[in-house]
């Protein structure tokens, strides 16, 4: 089997539970005899930078990272609010990264493409035409519920309203992903 994995942050070094879950999946894939190659693609942010030396050395593994700015801006948040799109997800989508992924899928035959979290799955719809692989969405959290809970516990009415909008847009995105993907794994 040949597998492409896209994550929204590097699994190594292991900084939190999400990193631990992604690292464990990668290690499990590499340990399977049926898996010939794992192409691991990861976004690298200021909060979660890429450290090549932290990844395991394995002849089955190739790693590609993409630096991306995901910092929150008032203008970006406002525009997303007006367009009724998820600002949480929009910050992780980048045209140059999409083109690199499309090129890799076009030039290589993968059996599976695994999207680690909703933030990586923002690329799924744009990548489908480039591969016959089965697409799998691996949910680490029910993201909209986290934001809904934040809204419930917020006193400031404007902030509460904005967090509710974020929760709603994430809920729509999660339902959309679940209805389109060919497989889903939740933790």
Predicted feature residues:
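Short N-terminal targeting/anchoring amphipathic segment
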Residues: 101-121, 134-136
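A short helix->loop->beta-strand "cap" motif at the edges of active sites that frequently abuts
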Residues: 35, 130-134, 181-182
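N-terminal subdomain of nucleotide-sugar transferases
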Residues: 1-64, 106-108
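Acceptor-binding helix/loop patch of EC 2.4 sugar-transfer enzymes
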Residues: 75-87, 136-172
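A short beta-strand/loop micro-motif in the catalytic core of glycosyltransferases
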Residues: 113-114, 174-187
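Short, well-ordered alpha-helical microsegments
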Residues: 47-50, 120-124
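A conserved catalytic-core segment of Leloir-type glycosyltransferases
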Residues: 40-104
